[in-house]
Amino acid sequence: MPSGQPVFPRRVPDAYIAMRGLVVASLLILLVGGTDAFRICAFNAHRLTLTKVIKESVMDTLVQILARCDIMVLQEVVDSSQNTVLFLLQKLQSSKSYSFLNSSLLGRSTYKEKYVYIYRSDKTQVLNFYQYNDTEDIFAREPFVAQFTLPSKILPSVVLVPLHTTPKDVEKELNALYDVFLDVSQRWQNENVILLGDFNADCASLAKKRLNSLLLRTKAGFHWVIPDGEDTTVRASTNCTYDRIVMHGQGCQKLLKAAATFDFPRRFQLTEEEALRVSDHYPVEVELNKAAQGIPPHCLSTLLLLSLSQLG
């Protein structure tokens, strides 16, 4: 081109601009949307009563723990009325919608406790529930089983089976939990089942050799997503993986994002003494993606850059 001749910028077609914007928007939706997860938790709240929760420090911590979860399964709720749970729901309802579902009081002696589901009613609903019929009295507190909807086309519902074992019968109860799985999966034709709670599945209550011989360990398809060796206790003097989450089903596996204990004393900067006023256990939790795990975020970032370069 002769020097001095004016150079006019090339006009970018509107269709090109629109396509570029669509690619960027679509990939960003995938990148950001992939981080959205549904959290299911289990927590041995250590003899939860109204007298305990009306203490401000305990109530504040419990509400913060509960607010993290889309479904929380509480154990050791020993209130014969609904007052404890209703009080907690009143504190939670300020920002989001919550409902609850509870079992009857369970136990063989004068000491009895409930299983209580507290859940985000704007994100999930109860489809079915029942108290397992423990005809042989194997369980001290037989599972209170519930089926919940999930915000996922891959897995529209999941079954939760909570259990708080008694320490002297851990092995027997955990082996019987396999029968509960068979019962519920046949009853509702759903093999996407999460077994969770304070199993007492470690230390003096269950030696490693006995743990590895459990039916839930030897039968195919069960995934213990809280690792052996993960401390689920608050006391510095103990290091035991009592609390567990066991998942079954292809849908659960496809949507699994993460599983962990929640170290609430560390998160909320509590001393051990302060934390023990709430519980001597950490909550355990599992996060499910709303869509199947597909392209990892770092690959999506690379794909975004490549797509933009191809568009010029």
Curated annotation (Swiss-Prot):
Belongs to the DNase I family. The gene is Dnase1l1. It is an enzyme of class 3 (hydrolase). One of its GO terms (biological process) is DNA catabolic process. The keyword Hydrolase applies. Pfam families: Exo_endo_phos. The active site is at residues 113, 164. One of its GO terms (cellular component) is endoplasmic reticulum. InterPro entries: Deoxyribonuclease-1_AS, DNase_I, DNASE_I_2, Endo/exonu/phosph_ase_sf, Endo/exonuclease/phosphatase. The lineage of its organism: Eukaryota, Metazoa, Chordata, Craniata, Vertebrata. SUPFAM superfamilies: DNase I-like. Residues 1-35 form the signal peptide. Disulfide bonds join 203-240. One of its GO terms (molecular function) is DNA binding. It comes from Rattus norvegicus (Rat). Keywords: Disulfide bond, Endonuclease, Endoplasmic reticulum, Glycoprotein, Hydrolase, Nuclease, Signal. This is Deoxyribonuclease-1-like 1. PANTHER family: DEOXYRIBONUCLEASE (PTHR11371), DEOXYRIBONUCLEASE-1-LIKE 1 (PTHR11371:SF28). Its EC number is 3.1.21.-. It is found in: Endoplasmic reticulum. The keyword Kinase does not apply. Glycans are attached at residues 102, 133, 239.
